[in-house]
């Protein structure tokens, strides 16, 4: 039996999370055939909303093989990451992708596995497919995700969360972990192991925490920059959260809220991180 996999693509998607999946499932077919199994274990199709080609976030075009609405015989539907750089882009981006979200919502009664990687997990959250379930997402959006979707249990450090009909994976190339997991689940652990070896993919990753980057080094927010400069200039002294708050002209509670919003960490953790 051939497992039909729909690879969703849309304008602004992360191109590798479409093409790399097609490559990995193609390799799975080759290895399956070479080891006495089916040469057509997986069939992948690139699907867009209207069946027309789209442009990925890297500027390259992705041809479409069919429209999402015309594909009724899928076993798996895989949503790629969205090419965004900041939390402030979310509302506009999600509004543009509303037709896709509505289509995902309509998929809820179908007996298929739906997956999403990285920032694409927000599309599943918007669709309602994750309501009452556990999920993971890219590390830099985990706090925003939890704030937006309190009815979803965020597992921020996990590379992959499988709830049965819905699977989410973490940041960046976690789509490779996701593909290997599907091969393991739908074919065999042995085939997944061989694919991981052949493609030189670490199939044993369980946490994305080692890959996270402290946001104050990436953010250009004036408050965080001013705070970092002050802390670095006072590393030889005992620095308190209250002293930092005074320097920034606000109360400690306000500072705490601002840091959680901007840097996804407490002021105390911010200070300790710079000291290290």
Where are the model-predicted features located?
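Extended, subdomain-level signal for the structured scaffold at the beginning of enzyme domains
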Residues: 1-114, 123-125, 184, 193, ...
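Structural detector of well-ordered beta-strand residues that form the stable sheet scaffold
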Residues: 114-115, 136, 155, 167
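A conserved active-site-flanking secondary-structure segment within enzyme catalytic domains
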Residues: 131-158
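HhH-family (HhH-GPD) DNA N-glycosylase catalytic core used in base-excision repair
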Residues: 143-146, 151-153, 200-204, 213-217
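Conserved Rossmann-fold dehydrogenase catalytic segment
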Residues: 154-167, 194, 198-201, 209-214
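Conserved anion/nucleotide-ligand pocket segment
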Residues: 162-198
